[in-house]
């Protein structure tokens, strides 16, 4: 469960980090992406552990709120699942069609940009 939560927060951060303040971005990145403890973050920024905890908790809530309103992560996951289905279909039905595979690769790359 904890790994899934970390992965989700890191994914949300990729989509919404530009909407966070610099301090929110730093705390949540250190905690979830870089695996710092609350104590390590509090020492680095010379604030209490409670202040760090409150900031991180508030930031997670903000990220979840953005996702509820904008659905960027969930839409991305749906599109990726569709790409996987299309790729499997192409590999099964048209295994020799390199041009079709190339088109799908290009479409997938444009999605990532």
From Swiss-Prot:
<dbReference type="InterPro" id="IPR007394">
    <property type="entry name" value="UPF0122"/>
</dbReference>
<dbReference type="InterPro" id="IPR054831">
    <property type="entry name" value="UPF0122_fam_protein"/>
</dbReference>
<comment type="function">
    <text>Might take part in the signal recognition particle (SRP) pathway. This is inferred from the conservation of its genetic proximity to ftsY/ffh. May be a regulatory protein.</text>
</comment>
<dbReference type="InterPro" id="IPR036388">
    <property type="entry name" value="WH-like_DNA-bd_sf"/>
</dbReference>
<dbReference type="InterPro" id="IPR013324">
    <property type="entry name" value="RNA_pol_sigma_r3/r4-like"/>
</dbReference>
<comment type="similarity">
    <text>Belongs to the UPF0122 family.</text>
</comment>
<dbReference type="Pfam" id="PF04297">
    <property type="entry name" value="UPF0122"/>
</dbReference>
<protein>
    <recommendedName>
        <fullName>UPF0122 protein PEPE_0845</fullName>
    </recommendedName>
</protein>
